């Protein structure tokens, strides 16, 4: 994760883009609790997921336009997606302890520390999932989807593992509880008394 710290000072974005992406990062890490002011649900209303996906897609499009030199979506690669994720990382709200911190590996540290705030792995993973879907919905083919690139998957795995160690929590998938096997059909009671 040290390569992220080095990236923070070297960004190609303008101040307005920084503010716009900071706002997008905030909406990515916090859940939207707003609902429609009209009491009923209309047929044209999008779900929270669809709205967030649209905002994320627009934010990434703005990132591409403000990139120096500007990038077209067709030229975007997994490396550009990683650059975007590393840039968003500085707007995170999750404390990730460094190896030198006395609270490294403690899920509930007893005191504050100077460790950096990062985007939580779950937020980054969800963001990439939404952008991956949006790319294909906007005409991109699954084979050329930069959000599904191997480098992006490896980066997310690295973030997950390093945050799990630093924060002392597990990101293991919860095992599904299997339903109990069906009981054999009940057989009718046979009466042994004569009629």
UniProtKB/Swiss-Prot annotation:
Localization, UniProt: Nucleus
Keywords: Developmental protein, DNA-binding, Nucleus, Transcription, Transcription regulation
Disulfide bonds: none
GO molecular function: DNA binding
Highest taxon listed in the record's lineage: Eukaryota
Annotated Low complexity bias: 28-38
Entry keyword annotation includes Ion transport: no
GO BP terms in the entry: mRNA transcription; post-embryonic plant morphogenesis
Segments carrying motif Nuclear localization signal: 173-177
UniProt note on tissues of expression: Induced by NAC054/CUC1 and NAC098/CUC2 in shoot organ boundary cells.
Role: Probable transcription regulator that acts as a developmental regulator by promoting cell growth in response to light. May suppress organ differentiation in the boundary region.
Family: Belongs to the plant homeotic and developmental regulators ALOG protein family.
Protein name: Protein LIGHT-DEPENDENT SHORT HYPOCOTYLS 4
Source species of the chain: Arabidopsis thaliana (Mouse-ear cress)
